[in-house]
């Protein structure tokens, strides 16, 4: 019985050591965002615009289908977060599994999800991976597109459909 108690207590203490090292998702993504800012991994709006027109760049969005349908950067690809590596294969590889687009800009609302996915994309072999906040795109009065349609979403939030700009951008 003493041995069982010693084992339980030691297991609890040993487990406590690991629990103290646990970092929350928010703290982890914040830490990665700070590192990305310091290392120059945060893309500028001009870099996103240039990437949309470049042959060797892909702008990929890791937000949910609903977020992407509500507002996305025209020309970006939604890869989601569940299996982004599979979705990327259709965008960045040719028929011989060679990179045709070896540079990525990863987009989400505030870059929290993008910075985490960027780590995986770097390990997959992408030469350059940058991160971008779609909120910045919108705040700087760039247009977004929506995948909602007035015909299908009559009870929606009265959002304008098609290309639209943030309200503060109206002249």
Residue ranges and their predicted role:
Residues 20-46, 51-54, 69-103, 112-171:
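Rhodanese-like catalytic fold shared by cysteine-dependent sulfurtransferases
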Residues 59-61:
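Structural scaffold elements adjacent to functional motifs in cytosolic proteins
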């Amino acid at each position: 019985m003493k041995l069982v108690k010693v084992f339980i207590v030691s297991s609890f203490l040993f487990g406590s050591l690991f629990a103290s090292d646990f970092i929350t998702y928010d703290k982890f993504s914040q830490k990665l965002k700070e590192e990305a800012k310091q290392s120059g991994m945060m893309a500028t709006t001009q870099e996103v615009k240039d990437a949309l027109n470049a042959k060797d760049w892909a702008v990929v969005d890791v937000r949910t289908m609903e977020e992407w349908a509500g507002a996305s950067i025209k020309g970006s690809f939604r890869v989601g977060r569940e299996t982004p590596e599979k979705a990327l294969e259709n965008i960045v590889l040719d028929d011989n599994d060679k990179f045709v687009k070896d540079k990525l800009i990863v987009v989400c609302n505030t870059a929290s999800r993008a910075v985490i996915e960027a780590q995986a994309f770097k390990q997959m072999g992408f030469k350059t991976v940058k991160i971008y906040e779609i909120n910045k795109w919108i705040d700087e009065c760039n247009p977004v597109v929506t995948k909602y349609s007035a015909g299908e979403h009559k009870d929606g939030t009265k959002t304008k459909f098609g290309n639209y700009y943030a309200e503060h951008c109206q002249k």
